[in-house]
Every structure is written in C-alpha cells, then in structure tokens.
C-alpha cells in the first residue's frame, strides 16, 4: 500500500502547503507563494510539468540559490531556465533517456524542449545511451558530492 503523497512534515508545519498537500512556488525563483522568503524545491513543490526527480531538484536548487543571492544583493532575478535529464540502464549496453527544458513564462513553468529515447532505436543508439547514462551519473554525482 502506498500512502497518499504530499510534501514533508516541515513544509506543512511551516504553513506553506496548500489543500493538495504540496507547496505552490513562484516558478521564477521557487519561493513559496504561501511564505515570503521561504524557498522550496524538489518533490515538495507544485512545479508541473517538471517531474519529481533528483535531477530536477538539483536544477531547482541552483535557481533558488541564485534567486536568494539576487534578493540579498538587490539584483534582478536570474532567468529561470531549468532542466531534467534521466538515463536508465536497462542492460549493460542498453540505455534509455528522457529530458526536458523548462522556463518560467506567464507565471507558470513551461516545457520548451525535451524528448525521450526513440522506441524503435537500434542497438548502436541504445549502446550510446548507456554510455551517456554512465557519464550523466558521474556528472550529477560530482555536482552533488564533489569530485
């Protein structure tokens, strides 16, 4: 049994969740719409069409940090350009991927580019995706934990 999904206890306790149990955010900064100077990212947010993924949260965190720095220094907000990329290794030489690029437009996040691995891709394509997947994993790991 999977329990109902929602933002964590701390978000609810801080009063930034809405009736859905998630945190609505400003797509330009990931500042909560329900709490000034409260920035939320990742699975806790209402950030559709972005998926709830670690890579998406990583780019959201970078945007939030840049927005906080801009706020503290009196600078304009950075342009909200976010990405999600995910590779899955189905076999040793068989990879698949999904990617999306998102921008804040008209008060909402909009997917402006992206795609998935072609369903009928040949073995060479799948092998390349497996190689890209290994490089992607190394890059995101280094970005998060350092090299």
Please name every model-derived segment.
Residues 1-2, 35, 39, 63, ...:
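Broad hydrophobic/π-residue packing in well-ordered secondary structure
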Residues 1-62, 70:
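FAD-site-proximal beta/loop scaffold in flavoenzymes
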Residues 3-6, 86, 90-94:
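Glycine-rich beta-alpha junction loops
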Residues 12, 33, 42, 58, ...:
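Generic signature of intrinsically disordered, low-complexity segments enriched in small/polar residues
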Residues 20, 29-32, 53, 81, ...:
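Generic serine detector
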Residues 21-39, 90-111:
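FAD-binding beta-loop-beta segment adjacent to the flavin cofactor pocket
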Residues 44-84, 88-90, 98-99:
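A conserved FAD-binding loop/helix module that cradles the flavin
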Residues 98-147:
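C-terminal auxiliary extensions adjacent to catalytic cores
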């Amino acid at each position: 049994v999977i329990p109902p999904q929602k933002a964590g206890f701390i978000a609810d306790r801080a009063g930034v969740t809405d009736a859905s149990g998630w945190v609505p955010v400003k797509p330009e900064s990931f500042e909560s719409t329900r709490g000034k100077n409260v920035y939320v990212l990742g699975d806790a947010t209402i950030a559709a069409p972005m998926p709830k993924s670690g890579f998406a949260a990583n780019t959201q965190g970078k945007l939030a940090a840049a927005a906080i720095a801009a706020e503290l220094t009196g600078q304009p907000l950075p342009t909200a350009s976010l990405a999600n990329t995910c590779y899955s290794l189905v076999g040793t030489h068989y990879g698949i991927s999904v990617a999306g690029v998102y921008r804040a437009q008209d008060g909402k996040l909009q997917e402006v580019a992206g795609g998935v691995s072609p369903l009928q891709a040949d073995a060479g394509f799948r092998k390349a995706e497996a190689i890209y997947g290994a490089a992607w994993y190394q890059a995101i790991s280094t970005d998060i934990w350092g090299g």
